Design a protein with these regions (language model features):
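Cytochrome P450
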Residues: 1-398
Length: 398
């Protein structure tokens, strides 16, 4: 961390689940620092929990002002488009979120849990039938959330593969060219337009049907309809898949932790929360926000019009909030992590993701108690050039 000038950010290429030491130095010495991301202008990076929470939740920081701007600091070639719920501020954000939230109520998520269990059981049945070794990324981590969010949105099973490929490109930082990313987003928008037309002709009890009805009542524009579909599809499966694959990798690379969960399955809910806190899922990129007025963050005055990036990965390792933050503690009780963000943009699907992670982990422990990696942990291949870090493959046996 430099005290003068601008530091390149992200600090370095992610290495497995390591958190770059520059975050700890920043929290200690310079919790708000000037950085330059691969695309866009310079901005502030905040690394302490309290400042990160402020940026995420304070209405003086705007996401809408970052939408569609070429000068927005970012790690992806393409700027976040306008019309997405991720790129809105209240009251527009509140209007759209209320509509979508009906599909993610606690009751609806609770009712969907048995279906999640059925999907997991089916995937594990197939893994058991084929026998070891198995790639848990391809056989479980990816197909589970794809199936869950697809069923909630009303995507036919035969179409699941289409948006799996699309979303991998939409989340690209360097793995694909800008032209490929733009084409992928356009293709996904086109598919969602087709799906909306299908649901218009034959409505169902699914989220896309509800969004189409809202659009036809003039409560949702065509752009909002398609961008919301993209957000739900990509956010609803890629992040959960990456989190689950990284979680199993972490547990199997520390066999004593896997054994603890096997012996004490009642710890799974708290283990999922600790996995969410401990795993730095994002590879360093975050949505920039713009200050709409001067805001004091610690000793730094962020001027109106300046961009700020908040690192939840760093906040989740802040020793001002978490005891022994670099320890992976499955019995941790005080755990107010920010893995799902905060403020009005806190992840809508947080409870759905928690449910999927819990069901999948509980089932894996029960069905394959002796699960282990087939290669040394340091030889497991990881994805590169994408927003979310995760094993590319997770070869296991039992």
């Amino acid at each position: 961390v430099t005290t003068v000038g601008t530091c390149p950010y992200p600090f370095g290429d992610p290495v497995r689940l390591d958190v770059h030491p520059s975050y700890a130095r920043s929290r200690a010495e310079q919790p708000a620092m000037r950085v330059r991301l691969p695309y866009g202008d310079e901005c502030w990076l905040v690394t302490r929990y309290s400042d990160v929470k402020t940026v995420l939740s304070d209405s003086r920081f705007s996401r809408a002002r970052a939408a569609g701007r070429e000068d927005t600091p970012r790690v992806t070639p393409e700027a976040a488009p306008a019309g997405s719920i991720l790129s809105m501020d209240p009251p527009e954000h509140s209007r759209l979120r209320r509509m979508i939230a009906r599909g993610f109520t606690a009751r609806r998520v609770r009712e969907f849990r048995p279906r999640t269990q059925e999907i997991v059981d089916g995937l594990l049945d197939e893994i058991e039938r084929v026998g070891p070794p198995a790639d848990l990324v391809e056989r479980l981590a990816l197909p589970l959330p794809v199936s869950v969010i697809s069923q909630m949105l009303g995507v036919p099973p035969a179409e699941h593969h289409r948006f799996r490929d699309f979303s991998a490109m939409v989340l690209s930082t360097t793995a694909f060219t800008r032209e490929e990313v733009v084409a992928a987003r356009a293709g996904l928008e086109e598919y969602l337009g087709e799906l909306a037309e299908q649901r218009r002709r034959v409505p169902g009890d699914d989220l896309m049907s509800a969004l189409v009805a809202a659009h036809d009542d003039d409560r949702l524009s065509e752009q909002e309809l398609r961008q919301t579909g993209i957000t739900l599809l990509v956010g609803g499966h890629e992040s959960t898949a990456s989190q689950f694959a990284s979680s199993v990798y972490l547990l199997l690379s520390r066999p004593e932790r896997w054994a603890l969960l096997r012996e004490r399955p009642e710890l799974v809910p708290s283990a999922v929360e600790e996995l969410l806190r401990f795993i730095p899922l994002g590879s360093g990129g975050a949505f920039a926000r713009y200050a709409v007025e001067d805001v004091q963050l610690g000793e730094v005055l962020v001027r109106a019009g300046e961009a700020v990036v908040a690192s939840t990965n760093s906040a989740n390792r802040d020793d001002r909030v978490f005891a022994d933050p670099d320890e992976f503690d499955l019995t941790r009780e005080h755990n107010p992590h920010l893995a799902f963000g905060g403020g009005v943009h806190v992840c809508l699907g947080a409870q759905l993701a928690r449910g999927e992670l819990q069901v999948a982990l509980e089932s894996l422990l029960t069905r394959f108690p002796d699960l282990r990696l087939t290669t040394p942990a340091e030889e497991v291949p990881w994805k590169e050039g994408t927003l979310l870090r995760s094993p590319r493959e997770l070869p296991v046996t039992w």
